[in-house]
Regions:
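N-terminal cap/lid segment of alpha/beta-hydrolase-fold proteins
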Residues: 1-5
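Conserved HGGG/HGGXW glycine-rich cap/lid loop of the alpha/beta-hydrolase fold
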Residues: 7-57
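Conserved catalytic-core motifs of eukaryotic protein kinase domains, centered on the activation segment
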Residues: 31-33, 56-61, 121-122, 177-178
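Conserved acidic catalytic loop of the alpha/beta-hydrolase fold
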Residues: 66-83
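Conserved hydrolase catalytic core segment
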Residues: 81-118
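Helical cap/lid subdomains and adjacent loops of hydrolase enzymes that gate the active-site channel
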Residues: 112-159, 175-178
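Conserved serine/cysteine hydrolase catalytic core
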Residues: 144-186, 194-196, 200-202, 206
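Catalytic active-site module of serine/aspartate enzymes centered on a nucleophile-bearing elbow/loop
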Residues: 190-222
């Protein structure tokens, strides 16, 4: 993350299992406070404000591959050699890109309502009036990327080696749930669960999400 000063929050004990949580398109690191509190007995959660968001602030360019690289830089800066990576929405895309590009750094992967790497036809609403806690250009860039994802993103799902949990939000989500199922089936060591919450699973059902994440982590070796 050359030239980018990245803000982040930490919750949980120093000897807990390290988990890096990546927020979605209108969130921030603070979006993970409830989940981190539910997991704090065994998990140390690191939650950055991604480029263009919160205290990290605007950047010169935006893409999910840049976010992936920022997160890898954060792991280096914090001397985190191998972690669980959890992402919601666009943060989940950055998470699976990291797992594919740096398998040695990702011990496990949790994808919460990940936009499938197929053209989605998402429509960005008009920019809200007044100051925003994020750079609107970041939202525009990410939505454009999700609507026209590189074909390699779909192809490379088969190369993810980390144990993976895909959390779908059910029929109330705007994402096509059958595509999430296809996505999960394409990742070799993935399983799919549904938390009936729509797209905003972390905000709408944090306790239920914490339970499925805790159970997933508890079943991992080591």
């Amino acid at each position: 993350m050359p030239g980018l000063r990245m803000a982040y929050r930490i919750w949980g004990p120093a000897d807990g299992r390290p988990l890096v949580a990546l927020h979605g398109g209108t969130g921030s690191g603070e979006s993970w406070a409830a989940l981190a509190a539910a997991l704090r007995a065994t998990t140390r959660t690191y939650a950055p404000d991604l480029r263009g968001y919160g205290a990290t602030g605007p950047a010169d360019a935006y893409s999910l591959e840049l976010v992936r690289d920022d997160v890898r830089g954060l792991l280096d800066a914090l001397a985190l050699t191998r972690v669980t990576v959890l992402g919601h929405s666009s943060g989940a895309v950055a998470a699976h890109l990291l797992a594919r590009a740096s398998p040695d750094r990702v011990a496990a992967l949790v994808l919460v309502e990940p936009p499938p790497p197929v053209p989605l036809g998402l429509r960005l609403p008009p920019r809200p009036a007044g100051p925003l806690p994020y750079d609107w250009a970041a939202r525009e860039a990410v939505v454009a990327e999700l609507n026209a994802p590189p074909p390699t993103w779909w192809e490379e799902l088969t190369e993810i080696t980390a144990p993976t949990l895909v959390v779908a939000g059910g029929p109330a989500s705007h994402l096509p749930q059958h595509e999430l199922a296809r996505m999960a089936a394409r990742i070799p060591a993935a399983r799919l669960v549904t938390v009936e919450a729509g797209h905003a699973v972390p905000a709408a059902r944090p306790a239920e999400l914490a339970t499925v994440v805790r159970d997933f982590l508890a079943a991992l070796p080591g």
